[in-house]
């Protein structure tokens, strides 16, 4: 029976275990360039035993970033910074991944550490480097976010090529794995959801029209991304609101993504509307007869059943319904819990976020807790810290020269 510390092979890449570092925006980049923070932040998690170490969402255009301080991969000049970090991740025995994204209407924010009060991220001013956000329709995410403009057909048609060019840069930077961000209300997800996509042309309305941009993006990336390297998509499998994107739709989209060359679905949820904990009211704007008319949807907000492993059922449904590899993510914090998710066939791997922020060495501790220390590579430089805890396999990590 496959467990958390069994290797996982996807195309030509074999991961040393089934623990991944989920992408987490750090708000530390300047003009999209990664720096020493990313080297230390991600390098520590590679040394801590994770098999897949994923960079934060990198904007495929400057306007595709969530915040003004997020990473990017829209310019060749940004490649070298990633190369340096990837060399260290590889030396530590992990595989490097990058999440490529376009934030769409949920962009041009101040970095999360600069947000004021309890209402979430604030829109960056032009003086702070902000821009006018754009999405499928002119519908703001919330009352404290700016109203985006609706994208033109020409702008939408350009998106797959923007992702493909970023994928080529990811290859030049030495990445082993690409994940496309099609979740959390960002651009690709906003086309999927009827809540945020009110278009009446070939990009909206029917299911086939709403998934069109996702599929075209997947095909464009697969055409330039090496055949031996995995391609994943992060999906929000439900919006958690009536009339939104559904699990059944996610299963069908996952089938079609698999046919387009996608290897794994990173199954998350939500993000199209504010969560119930956000006190702001959700507003939508519908273009009707050429006039922009406001429509208040009352307290339209996601009712998310937060709890340990709350998104695992969605991952399991996609795995069985679409016959594709899946990663489970969301409030996975306990080694026994994570191991059971894999052993019970509910997911093929787990992605940890905040738990790995709290403890970069969580994989090592999990291996010890599960009696799998012999299968965990621990840096020999840390021998004294782990030898008396049951660690038995130590590998050197060569410093950069």
Which residue stretches match the model-derived regions?
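Flavin-dependent oxidoreductase catalytic cores
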Residues: 1-401
